Regions:
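Generic helix N-cap/helix-start motif at coil->alpha-helix transitions
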Residues: 538-543, 570-576
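Bacterial Sec-dependent signal peptides at the C-terminal "C-region" and cleavage site
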Residues: 8-21
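Non-catalytic C-terminal accessory modules of carbohydrate-active enzymes
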Residues: 153-171, 590-735
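Alpha-helical repeat scaffolds
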Residues: 557-564, 596
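Extracellular/oxidizing-compartment recognition motifs
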Residues: 19-354, 363, 378-384, 401-408, ...
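Solenoid-like repeat scaffolds
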Residues: 563-570, 600-604
């Protein structure tokens, strides 16, 4: 219900904004370099009010980011979203300014950052711009607004950020702060005009601002005779550095970076500050991430650092779920997985918050699964945004590709695109949210994309290269079977959504294709494992796991497949999620946990990094970043297949509870869209106890593990054929 309220509060992403903004104008500064890379512009507008209205809803669109102060009070910290609900459109924000206003004279100041560069999550319009309108205030941006070009904002010295990032490394020269001349703004167009295009209301919350925190630090000297002040942070976070410094002179260059200055193999975001004489405070507004903040300056500089601090910001949701168990390694993993998930959420889902900040859909399918089980329903809006962006960027020929939004990436990764529309992507979103409207929105795009896929002469999914034939990091990837498995799951999702959206006439063809794929896949069974005849590498654990997950492999093959999994470990942390899920589903949960601890153990126990890795070690394949949330997939496996909680009816109106006590004791709370669900079980010798909370308006089907002769619920004999209504239940089971 809460998610329905959230979505109702947002305008539909595929619809134009029917706005009253006809008198508002896009504006920018009168300066020849206003559209260049890393341009900063300040706007100012005075406003006289006879009285403060009860509501002052204000529409703001900016290319690319903005900070808003009203009467000297911060109203928005980093507003705006990276551009691209579709290739030609932009986002706008809505904020109520009434709490910041007063009777009489008011002043609004907006600091605008124009990226001026395409990135892996941003489509550059080519022009800086701001448009503001409030019907409640009679406010509209136009040439009466003052603006100034800000020469104090510059690019930092090398190394510059890698090509994937649209953001620049900021350099702020305080010696020339405020030197730009105030002028009347230049009017550039109306609401909806090019190059910014159609404006779509922001579908996700504003960032959570945790405020500024000062930190203690240590001091060292590096090889270049620079003083390095290092401050350990509580965890990997999105932060903007804050310094308080006195310089006897002026012109000292103070560098600011984190321990994630290189996201594995590539340079990421850092910043510089040039001092003026005297005492000064500065916050560098371009966010970076890491567990350690470093302030670096020449050893011979006559400066005093009074304090180092940071402002943490993050996605506007809460960690309302919880989990503890009797296995401390899994508890440690859970904490790192949640931290990794959160730092990979902002304008979009990310693969990593340092190197790329890109919405790769293989990652998204795993990140959203974790989010549904542990984050408050507000987080579902980021999945909603990701899904609509993916289909709205579909090419005319039907191709889907990611990451999008993007201006510097155009390649299809066929395996990831099938995953995106599969039962782990679009359909999984529907199961957890109940958002049928989005399924109706996306089905035509799914159908067009699936039409690009064909079968070969054997009835198996034909190879589709796309722009990059990527199935996983690592080696020994049986791509023909991997594509076939994802194709099968995408067809399953399409059939489900076709039935939901009154397109049932499409279902027989989807089922025909699935039957053909399953038969051809099983022809690749050699008696002990699956291999495609054209594949000459070591047998791939990924495709054997996918055979189980799809249901293509029947139970008669499970014992042989178990022996296969004991001998093969080729999957990266990305595809390992599906291997572990397959093991649990085939009754080998204990081995799945052993394999999980063996493979993930080093990153779980790593004392430096509070997040999970892209590869099996720091600096491994794929660039080797140390904050890749695809490594958190086991969180979903535990919630769904060990705690045994999954929706039976979309939106958790009905759900099942099938605990699998391969972990002797687990206690999980899920903040579903229907309310909080708690399941806590403990097995001890011949007894098993389960405590369950069923939210109001929902029903639960409970299946107790086999082997118990007496099952009592709240002191009465349990009838497993009956669904449980809302309430609290205690199951006591004995053998």
């Amino acid at each position: 219900m809460l998610f329905a309220v959230i979505i109702a509060a947002f305008s539909a992403m595929c619809a134009s904004c029917e706005s009253p903004e006809s008198d508002a104008r896009w504006i920018s500064v009168d300066h020849p370099e206003c559209d260049e890379y890393n341009t900063w512009i300040e706007f100012s507008k005075d406003l006289e009010l006879d009285k403060v209205p009860g509501s002052a809803l204000t529409h703001i669109a900016a290319d690319s980011k903005y900070w808003l102060w009203v009467n000297g009070r911060m109203a928005v910290f980093e507003g705006g979203l990276k551009r691209g609900p579709d290739p030609l459109s932009s986002y706008y924000d809505v904020i109520d300014l009434a709490p910041y206003l007063k009777t009489g004279e008011n002043n609004m100041k907006i600091l605008l950052w124009h990226f001026g560069k395409d990135g892996f999550s941003h489509k550059d319009s080519g022009k800086s711009g701001l448009i503001v309108k409030s019907k409640d205030l009679g406010l509209a941006s136009d040439s009466s607004w003052l603006s100034r070009y800000m020469p104090e904002y510059q690019e930092a010295t090398d190394p510059e950020p890698n090509y994937r990032l649209s953001e620049a490394n900021l350099r702020y020269d305080s010696r020339i702060a405020g030197k730009g001349e105030w002028k009347a703004s230049v009017e550039l167009g109306k609401w909806g005009d090019e190059p910014w295009g159609r404006l779509v209301e922001r579908p996700i919350p504003f960032w959570k601002d945790y405020g500024i925190t000062n930190v203690s630090f240590t001091q060292d000297l590096d090889d270049a005779s620079n003083i390095v002040l290092s401050a350990r942070l509580p965890y990997n976070m999105h932060l903007t550095p804050v310094i308080d410094v006195t310089d006897v002179n002026e012109g000292t260059c103070i560098k600011m970076e984190t321990n994630h200055i290189k996201g594995g193999s590539e340079y990421c975001i850092r910043a510089e500050y040039i001092t003026s004489a005297g005492r000064q405070q500065y916050e560098s507004l371009g966010w970076m991430n890491g567990e350690e903040l470093r302030i670096i300056y020449p050893a011979d500089a006559e400066i005093t650092i009074h304090s180092i601090g940071y402002r943490e910001t993050g996605f506007g949701c809460e960690r309302e779920g919880s989990f503890t168990c009797s296995d401390e390694t899994i508890n440690m993993f859970w904490e790192k997985a949640m931290r990794t998930l959160y730092v990979n959420m902002r304008d979009t889902y990310f693969d990593c918050p340092d190197r790329e900040r890109a919405q790769w859909w293989g990652d998204v399918t795993i990140l959203t699964g974790q989010s549904y089980y542990q984050l408050s329903p507000e987080a579902n809006s980021l999945a909603y945004k990701a899904i609509h962006e993916l289909v709205n960027w579909q090419r005319e020929d039907g191709t889907l590709y990611s990451p999008v939004p993007a201006g510097s990436w155009h390649n299809e990764l066929p395996a990831q695109m099938l995953a995106s529309i599969s039962t782990y992507g679009f359909w999984y979103y529907y199961l957890h949210t109940g958002d049928a409207e989005t399924m109706a929105d996306v089905y035509p795009a799914m159908k067009r994309y699936l039409a690009l896929w064909t079968l070969d002469e054997d009835g198996l999914t034909a190879f589709r290269k796309g722009g990059w034939s990527w199935g996983d990091w690592g080696y020994d990837i049986d791509m023909r079977l991997l594509l076939a498995a994802w194709h099968y799951l995408a067809l399953e999702s399409a059939a489900n959504i076709a039935e939901l959206t009154d397109e049932a006439a499409d279902i027989p063809e989807y089922r025909r294709l699935q039957d053909s794929i399953a038969k051809a896949y099983n022809k690749c069974w050699n008696g002990k494992e699956y291999r495609h005849p054209s594949y000459d590498g070591a047998t791939d654990d990924r495709v054997n796991a996918m055979a189980i997950i799809t249901g293509i492999a029947d139970t008669s093959k499970y014992d042989a497949l178990f022996e296969h999994f004991k001998e093969h470990e080729h999957a990266s942390p990305y595809m390992e999620k599906y291997v572990l899920e397959a093991l649990v589903k085939t009754g080998h949960g204990a081995y799945a946990l052993d394999r999980f601890k063996k493979r993930f153990g080093p990153m779980i126990s790593d004392p430096v990094y509070t997040t999970l890795f892209e590869s099996w070690e720091v600096g491994g394949y794929g660039g080797g970043s140390t904050n890749h949330a695809w490594s958190g997939g086991m969180l979903t496996v535990i919630a769904e297949n060990i705690c045994g909680l999954r929706p039976l009816v979309p939106g958790w109106k009905e759900f099942e509870v099938c605990p699998n006590p391969v972990i002797p004791e687990c206690d999980i709370t899920i903040p579903s869209v229907a309310g909080k669900i708690r399941s806590a079980f403990k097995t001890d010798g011949d007894s098993f106890v389960l405590n369950l909370t069923v939210p109001k308006g929902t029903k639960a089907s409970v299946r107790i593990p086999d082997g118990y002769s007496e099952i009592l619920v709240n002191g009465k004999t349990f009838d497993s054929s009956k669904k449980l209504k809302s309430g609290s239940y205690e199951f006591r089971c004995t053998k």
